[in-house]
Swiss-Prot record:
Belongs to the TRAFAC class OBG-HflX-like GTPase superfamily. OBG GTPase family. The lineage of its organism: Bacteria, Bacillati, Cyanobacteriota, Cyanophyceae, Synechococcales. It comes from the Bacteria. It comes from Prochlorococcus marinus subsp. pastoris (strain CCMP1986 / NIES-2087 / MED4). This is GTPase Obg. One of its GO terms (cellular component) is cytoplasm.
Amino acid sequence: MQFIDQANIILKAGKGGNGIVSFRREKFVPAGGPSGGNGGKGGSIIIIADNNLQTLLDFKFNREIFAKDGFKGGPNKRSGASGENTILKVPCGTEIRDFNTGIILGDLTEDKQSLTIAHGGRGGHGNAYYLSNQNRAPESFTEGKEGEIWEVQLELKLLAEVGIIGLPNAGKSTLISVLSSARPKIANYPFTTLIPNLGVVRKADGNGCLFADIPGLISGAAEGVGLGHDFLRHIQRTKILIHLIDSIAENPIRDFEIIEKELKRYGSGLLNKERIVVLNKMELVDENYLQTITKKLENLSKKKVLVISSSLRKGLSPLLSEVWKRI
């Protein structure tokens, strides 16, 4: 499935129904009073969060969305029916912004949480509304009001509690696959992961925690190089970041610094998030070299560095223990 995590759409609520001019003309009431009913309210557009959705793909080609108009009033003071509301379902974690001003209109983080964006127009008045002592036979009516029009930007930010970050080929996909039931595409070349992978990791008590393998970040990601902005946004909601470093990379220290620099440049408090620094692929390097790199990383990060092998499933228990302590 294609992953779409941002969409710009135009929402147009329904117009209110018109009021009508009508007079009672019953057999025994030859000169009855005004009886024109009011028009119905136009339909509104309501956005609802749905736990079963994981992408904004539905809006890739459907960029203009309408609600139904209200119906005109009827005789005998009957009001017109309201226009049907249009319901848009989005994944939990969808933020809604005014496209023109950037103002956040809503942030739907829980299942079934809803937000009415475009309100339907009010129905017009029929002539019965204008009856008064001064005017016993009014012929006035009003048309329904136009519905609201909004241009909005939908932006999905994953609701994972733990984000796994690192340069391409650091082993993020392998790690999430062995920790959870996720089955991401894995290969020995950079940029295998083009969309965030999600996996539920179970604690001993059976409760689950959602992990996200954030696609490989590169230098310049904070300025949008590669798909930097698209991927960094998904880190914002996480509670903890696992910074995974490839021990067989040409320069693991430089790799660590690249990601830290991008977190700082992107802002939004990313650099202040809890981070666990992890050196991966321990089985592929000499023990002395591993100790040297570990010590350098600890001095640089001011944190204890964990050493693991995702493919051999070594060092994973201490890693998860650190995660559970921080959530």
